[in-house]
Amino acid sequence: MIRQLNYWSRKAYLIYPFQVFVGALLSIVVSSETLNHQKETCALLKSSNIFNVIFAYKANQLWPFLFFSLAFLQIYFHYLARMDILPLPISSTETSSSYLTYTNHWPLLKNRIISIMITQYACKFVLKYLLLFLNFQFIDHVFIWTGGECSSGSKTTSAEKCRLENGKWDGGFDISGHFCFLVSISMILWMELHLFSRFVQAEDMFWVVNKWVRACLAIVCAVLVIWICILWVTAIYYHTILEKVLGCLMGFICPVFIYHILPKIGILHNYLYL
């Protein structure tokens, strides 16, 4: 399972652009009348379908559970992997000095591992919400600036508030919030799965991967697959091609910053990474 996770998590970034490409292709090949008819007659293609409501609209409530489950696994496995960094004494002549060194240094090392990784994941968690907030501020304001408005008549500038008022975005250039949001939170989980599976392989810690670890990983993967299915509907039946392309591209801003830019900021590296 770990090896398969390592492989698929490395390829995950290709899934979402491929979905946009296929959706764009189908929107050219299949008439809009056919697509609209399918969307109106099939319950699973409507934005109000149960999967979309639970796994997309409520994803912000679900995602922290998945993220912190993977964070716990990362911290636990890093902790176990470093338990043997400081060797125990192997002879009686070494007992007094070596054992004293071990007992003095191990608590410090243990505390450093835990504190650094907790700080790292707290930083990732905050950055996810901050960057997505900025993304959606941009998306919503572009929509308003290009003549869009909420059908509820409330003059709100937030797509989320418009939905809660049972309104719909009308007019305007509507960058796909579904793609931006689901790609962002999915890629963060994919990156965590990749880091975890790579670490387990590098440290040869397959023996620690018990049924509970596998169950946790399976739940995360199942939700990721559901999000991919939801995005297939968005890619084929909703938004213009450019709106989907921009939504997908904006979805990569958050994970790229967290996993590729943040680790290269020297002043923060010693505080966030082992």
UniProtKB/Swiss-Prot annotation:
EC numbers on record: 3.6.1.-
Pfam family, one: FIT
Outcome of swapping E243A: Inositol auxotrophy. Impaired ER morphology and aberrant lipid droplet (LD) budding
Gene Ontology terms for molecular function: coenzyme A diphosphatase activity; hydrolase activity, acting on acid anhydrides, in phosphorus-containing anhydrides
Keyword list, A-Z: Endoplasmic reticulum, Hydrolase, Lipid biosynthesis, Lipid metabolism, Membrane, Phospholipid biosynthesis, Phospholipid metabolism, Transmembrane, Transmembrane helix, Vacuole
Localisation per UniProt entry: Endoplasmic reticulum membrane; Vacuole
Record field: transmembrane: 12-32, 61-81, 125-145, 171-191, 216-236, 248-268
Topology, Lumenal side: 33-60, 146-170, 237-247
A GO cellular component annotation in the UniProt record: endoplasmic reticulum lumen
Catalytic activity: an acyl-CoA + H2O = an acyl-4'-phosphopantetheine + adenosine 3',5'-bisphosphate + 2 H(+); (9Z)-octadecenoyl-CoA + H2O = S-(9Z-octadecenoyl)-4'-phosphopantetheine + adenosine 3',5'-bisphosphate + 2 H(+); (5Z,8Z,11Z,14Z)-eicosatetraenoyl-CoA + H2O = S-(5Z,8Z,11Z,14Z-eicosatetraenoyl)-4'-phosphopantetheine + adenosine 3',5'-bisphosphate + 2 H(+); hexadecanoyl-CoA + H2O = S-hexadecanoyl-4'-phosphopantetheine + adenosine 3',5'-bisphosphate + 2 H(+)
Residues exposed to the Cytoplasmic side: 1-11, 82-124, 192-215, 269-274
Membrane topology field: Multi-pass membrane protein
Domain of life of the source: Eukaryota
Paired cysteines (S-S): none
InterPro entries: FIT (IPR019388), YFT2 (IPR046398)
Role according to the record: Fatty acyl-coenzyme A (CoA) diphosphatase that hydrolyzes fatty acyl-CoA to yield acyl-4'-phosphopantetheine and adenosine 3',5'-bisphosphate. Preferentially hydrolyzes unsaturated long-chain acyl-CoA substrates in the endoplasmic reticulum (ER) lumen. This catalytic activity is required for maintaining ER structure and for lipid droplets (LDs) biogenesis, which are lipid storage organelles involved in maintaining lipid and energy homeostasis. May directly bind to diacylglycerol (DAGs) and triacylglycerol, which is also important for LD biogenesis.
Name this protein carries in UniProt: Acyl-coenzyme A diphosphatase YFT2
This protein's encoding gene: YFT2
